[in-house]
Design a protein with these regions (language model features):
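Flexible, glycine/charged-enriched surface loops at secondary-structure junctions
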Residues: 60, 116-118, 175-180, 230, ...
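Zn-dependent metallopeptidase/amidohydrolase metal-coordination segment
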Residues: 12-25, 82-83, 350-400, 405-408
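N-terminal capping segment at the start of a domain
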Residues: 2-36, 326, 383
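Active-site metal-coordination/substrate-binding segment of hydrolases
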Residues: 47-51, 56, 60, 66-167, ...
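Midchain, well-structured core segments that form catalytic/ion-binding scaffolds
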Residues: 128-129, 133-294
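Alpha-helical metal-binding/catalytic segments enriched in His/Glu/Asp
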Residues: 19, 81, 91-130, 215-221, ...
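His/Asp/Glu-rich mid-to-C-terminal helical/loop segments that flank catalytic regions of hydrolases
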Residues: 227, 231-256, 300-305, 350, ...
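A short beta-alpha structural unit
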Residues: 34, 264-273, 285-291, 317-336, ...
Length: 424
């Protein structure tokens, strides 16, 4: 495939900006929660673009959408790319959306140049990646890859008691294809990094060898509420004081296992939350991550051991429950190498970046060779209305996606017209 082949960066940007108008917020972000009317509008727009590009569209029973460009040999499993178009309540324009529309731009570029691939090319968008309306996160790809059942997903409810199945049917995306029956030859996902590493290193492309595993916990510390004035310090059963020592240990554990140890307390509830009452109970979340599963398990064991010691030393009631776990996900060497080779061929500055966030690709990796491409986002900010990315970086990532997919899909002989380079 000629090294001069490039996508149309302006067309990609225009598509991103048009999709971002659906659910646009006053602060420049997007609120398009999964399976809402706005999600339906976004889905309809992307599906319409796919059909304009000559693609056929299939929807499965969890609402995952697969848009297919035929290959010379349609019996071959497709080379797929994709991501999601649902957002956080205060989301940005690029998280997920970039991966879907970069895939669409790959197809448009192949159409422009009359290129026929040996294997079909598919672009997917997965249902409820964000998990901001329904739990679990990455629902569509998880059901597709067998991480949990369709029945479990259907039964999930939002805060108003509406179920996933009801909402899929209501918006017209309750498909007929059985999840997981759709073959994948290889899967690539282009994404903004959602962190500051690439920008800090002044690199354009992140080659992603793996995604960190994580353990999530709910922790409750129970003491005794009492008046803040009359109760001496030595006679208190202060739940917040003890909870704080556990929170500090979360950070200490992460710092013991650099460079990929992560420890976060993101949610805290204090009861009764009164200025002059010693807290009687504290509930909080714990998030531990590492790219090495053995180290992640060590962090888990150290967390439990510290809680047990603290319970014994303080005499307070302390409960900790692991509520979610997924192991680190190393991506397939062939896909990682395809991304690396495409980046080097195109001359972009690059570095390896381990993903600290979960993506649909961690589930596709269970059923097909998978890989990811990162591009920088401004100040590393994501899941925020001010999320931003440079058009040139988005274009570069899409060019890498194009060449990596072509390397895997193959190009039929005599299938490229002269003058094949699209405008950059």
């Amino acid at each position: 495939m000629p090294d001069t082949l490039r996508i149309n960066g302006q067309r990609l940007w225009n598509s991103l900006m048009e999709l971002a108008q659906i659910g646009a917020t006053d602060k420049g972000g997007v609120k398009r929660l999964t399976l809402t009317d706005l999600d339906r509008q976004g889905r309809d727009l992307v599906v319409g673009w796919a059909r304009e590009a000559g693609m056929t569209v299939t929807v499965d029973k969890i609402g995952n959408v697969f848009m297919r460009r035929p290959g010379r040999d349609d019996s071959l499993p497709p080379v797929m790319t994709g991501s999601h178009i649902d957002t956080q309540p205060t989301g940005g324009k690029f998280d997920g959306n970039y991966g879907v529309l970069a895939g669409l731009e790959v197809v448009r570029t192949l159409n422009d140049q009359g290129i026929v691939t040996d294997a079909p090319i598919e672009v997917a968008f997965w249902t409820n990646e964000e998990g901001s309306r329904f739990v679990p996160v990455m629902m569509g790809s998880g059901v597709f890859c067998g991480a949990f059942s369709l029945e479990t997903a259907y039964a999930a409810k939002d805060v108003e008691g509406k179920t996933v199945r009801e909402e899929l049917e209501r918006i017209g995306y309750l498909g007929s294809e059985e999840p997981g029956r759709h073959p994948i030859g290889a899967y690539f996902e282009a994404h903004i990094e959602q962190g500051p590493v690439l920008e800090d290193a002044n690199k354009v492309i992140g080659v992603v060898p793996a995604v960190m595993g994580l353990s999530w916990y709910d922790c409750t510390v129970s003491g005794m509420e009492a008046h803040a004035g009359p109760t001496p310090m030595g006679l208190r059963r202060d739940a917040l004081q003890v909870a704080t020592t556990i929170m500090q240990e979360v950070v200490a554990i992460a710092n013991r296992y650099p460079p990929y140890g992560r420890g976060t307390v993101g949610m805290v509830q204090v009861f009764p939350n009164s200025r002059n009452v010693i807290p009687g109970q504290v509930k909080f979340s714990i998030d531990l991550r590492n790219v090495n599963d053995e180290l992640l398990n060590t962090m888990h064991e150290e967390m439990l051991a510290f809680v047990a010691r603290t319970r014994q030393e303080t005499g307070l009631g302390i409960e900790i429950e692991r509520v979610s776990y997924y192991p680190p996900c190393p991506f397939h060497p062939d896909c990682v190498n395809a991304v690396r080779a495409a980046t080097e061929k195109l001359g972009y500055s690059t570095m390896d970046v381990v993903s600290g966030a979960g993506h649909d690709a961690i589930y596709t990796a269970r059923v097909a060779p998978s890989g990811m491409i990162f591009v920088p986002c401004k100040d590393g900010i994501s899941h925020n209305e001010i999320e931003d990315a440079q058009p040139a970086h988005l274009e570069a990532g899409c060019n890498v996606l194009l060449h990596a997919m072509l390397e895997r899909a193959g190009v039929a002989k005599d299938a490229v017209r002269e003058g094949e380079a699209a405008s950059a």
